[in-house]
Amino acid sequence: TNNFPEFTGRLCPAPCETACVVGINVDPVTIKQVELRTIEEAFGANIVAPQIPDRLTGKTIAVIGSGPAGLAAAQQLTRAGHTVAVYERAEKIGGLLRYGIPEFKMEKNIIDRRLAQMEQEGTRFRPGVNVGVDITGSQLRSKYDAIVLAVGATQWRDLPVPGRELKGIYQAMEFLPWGNKQALGEVENPPINVAGKHVVILGGGDTGADCLGTSVRQGAASVTQLEIMPRPTEERPSGQPWPT
């Protein structure tokens, strides 16, 4: 049921483990670790073979966006026998997986390994094509039998607070892609670089943690992280025995 357990096994916060009823009495099932270990053992044993369809349907499909949703859709449609092309405006396929998730959380060769399998199955990739600019929707509709929109959310949430307009304040998705490109050797001096600077991160979730790790690796002088929620306890609270 999961096309890419090697991605989710590394990146998913595993709410299923928090909700696992086994956790009432003992430690919950380590679903995330089981998933990751299984797929890595399979890749290591070279048994993750491409699933090439027995016959083609003759239908052509364009998938716009090469993040996890677009790649999953493309793989399923290719395996069903359709001819699928994935369009991505960035120079490399992967979307948020490649340019949003830091290298220290998931190495990019993990993505490339899966893309190689998808290419063997028949999926075609069209990086560096900005749909709506380089090619119109009408052109795609005339070329393909169906189009899947998997462009993701490109509008971030902002904080309308005094001083927001000041210099040196960035959104996470302005900062992280440049950090990824620097780690990959695509740029030497990214336009947003916190080396030697004092950094304040607003937000204590996964994205905030990614910004923290990237800032430390760029050589920030200090990093302070602010979170609106209280610090969670080390153990399950006595008044909350049931998993959530």
PLM regions and their residue ranges:
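C-type cytochrome heme c attachment motif
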Residues: A14, T18-A19, A85
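Ferredoxin-type iron-sulfur electron-transfer modules in oxidoreductases and energy-metabolism complexes
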Residues: T1-R10, A14, V22-R55, G179-N180
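Residues forming the flavin
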Residues: L36-T244
